[in-house]
């Protein structure tokens, strides 16, 4: 058993809690980046490159027929092989949270395409389900079981938002435990069936699950409803006859309780549980070995790694299984090390015999990576079957927006008091994010419509008529730089015309003499 710190390299700033690792043979892929994918790597999936204690993430390539896979935090991930104990050929990915905190309900299947030009490509497809379709959730588990020559996927646990008919402005963003149902999914026909077992009374999430033959073992986890970590092992046995499947559950008292732990496999029948939490404020620093056979399970405490001072004093930690007995986990950087580019320290804990640095390699040789030329900004990035369009070192971390600055919960003005935990919908068009409007001052910036005291009528008028908007701080500046309108000159009455005398018609001498004689 070895524990060593690794040096963060390119793109490691995209690593965040809730990520997942997919290991195909000797290749490990990272899923669940921070924020939405950028143009430099639109796939959002990276190859984990660990050499000489340097950790790097290199953009992965997908085939042309792949569907889009969003970055997902805390999804249920499980490997799938065509035969029991065979080589991993597929990964199943269900649920998880997107960067917008929306919870996914989709099921994806990830496979490794044949290598072309010494590079590996991935293929992602979406699987439609029918029957008792599981609701959108995260923090749950999936496992593949084999029975009577057939296989099925067992899904259990997780959290989700409250049903729409129960959500109000006060609890709009609150999550609850999903119902303690066991879902049995037939991948061949896309059918899903739910089972309500009396041994499972409370919802459970962030637990550990292991599968052997036709049995799934569920350890630990956290029940949000009663804030409880049960010290039980739930043994779920699946029978797949020609007719309807049968599912049963047995409760075993293990006397250990934890949540958010990581499990890694060291041999076909041996596993190690490491990390996690014993309570909301207490990390779990001990390790347990799990030994499985056909009918029994044995859990023992094993040797604990020599944790560093940073790990012991850190309040939080997170990680994922790298495969073959290795675990990658990180802890937040304290205030003394804020000068570093990365927000986390990363460690590799290895319970196996092989060095994970030798297991994980990058796409292509080291010489190809160092000598490769970066793509120009004008070039378009596409999904390519040949795997030549992406260069591993072209991802620019500066392109990654800081969610604290560009998200919906920014401080848009001095009087802004938007808080993710206390915000309530104000406009009829809002759902789970506040409405924002773009201010056109200089380069432009986003502000909250509610902070600008905009009425819903005015907000609709501005958006429908495509009118430039200036926020309260910049509206006076915007008026000052506007070109003055041309006004016609004021028409002034001439003083000469005012003083002009009226015209007097003078009579001729003939008319005067005629009028004189007439009146005489």
UniProtKB/Swiss-Prot annotation:
The keyword Zinc-finger applies. GO terms for cellular component: DNA recombinase complex; nucleus. Gene3D superfamilies: Kelch-type beta propeller (2.120.10.80), Rag2 PHD finger (3.30.160.290). The gene is rag2. This is V(D)J recombination-activating protein 2. SUPFAM superfamilies: FYVE/PHD zinc finger, Galactose oxidase, central domain. Belongs to the RAG2 family. A zinc finger (PHD-type) spans 415-477. One of its GO terms (molecular function) is chromatin binding. It comes from Xenopus laevis (African clawed frog). The atypical PHD-type zinc finger recognizes and binds histone H3 trimethylated on 'Lys-4' (H3K4me3). The atypical PHD-type zinc finger also binds various phosphoinositides. Component of the RAG complex composed of core components rag1 and rag2.
